[in-house]
């Protein structure tokens, strides 16, 4: 079995466990994204995960676990790294618009190449520090995964949404200490415990809004 076939098998089994349906084209885009990440990773050190099969679990399936919970049409993924979770979510939601923000040029170059190679029309990679970035219009969702504490995320990103916008943070263990540190200007509107196929460890989603 080729690595491409192995990745496809892991993906299909993961999608089934997550009760998600993606087209053959979307599945192929996700496999190709992992293969591209693995290729670039050897030279540019985009992620500490070295095994492409582990990338499929720890990066792709972990990102796709958000799919049932993602609302809004105009989404920014801050501190996205090589495009996580924004790139897999953009593949899953071709009708939504995604801005993928990172301050490191090598990551943004990789994302730009990925967008071109995968034929994605709904992704805009941007190189910038989050506090220096301003969208043309307020975003519906500010999304983060392994980016910063909730307090820092809200401080740096509050200008990216209006009163209706939401902040959505993907965390490991339930971040009780971080929640207690959140400014009085924001409130936690919802939390969700996620199960990611083949991934050991806790995963939680935290929604926050301006008061």
UniProtKB/Swiss-Prot annotation:
* Keyword Signal assigned: no
Listed GO MF terms = rRNA (guanine-N7-)-methyltransferase activity
GO CC, sorted alphabetically, is: cytosol
Q: Which UniProt keywords apply?
A: Cytoplasm, Methyltransferase, rRNA processing, S-adenosyl-L-methionine, Transferase
The record's subcellular locations are:
Cytoplasm
List ligand-binding residues for S-adenosyl-L-methionine. Answer: 79, 84, 130-131, 145
- The UniProt record lists the keyword rRNA processing: yes
A Pfam family this protein belongs to? GidB
**Coiled-coil region(s):** none
Q: Which Gene3D superfamilies match?
A: Vaccinia Virus protein VP39 (3.40.50.150)
Q: Which reaction does it catalyse?
A: guanosine(527) in 16S rRNA + S-adenosyl-L-methionine = N(7)-methylguanosine(527) in 16S rRNA + S-adenosyl-L-homocysteine
EC number(s) per entry: 2.1.1.170
Entries under CDD domains matching the protein? AdoMet_MTases (cd02440)
Similarity-based family:
Belongs to the methyltransferase superfamily. RNA methyltransferase RsmG family.
**PANTHER family per record:** S-ADENOSYL-L-METHIONINE-DEPENDENT METHYLTRANSFERASES SUPERFAMILY PROTEIN
HAMAP family (UniProt xref)? 16SrRNA_methyltr_G
Q: What is the stated purpose of this protein? A: Specifically methylates the N7 position of guanine in position 527 of 16S rRNA.
Q: What is this protein called?
A: Ribosomal RNA small subunit methyltransferase G
- Name the source organism: Alteromonas mediterranea (strain DSM 17117 / CIP 110805 / LMG 28347 / Deep ecotype)
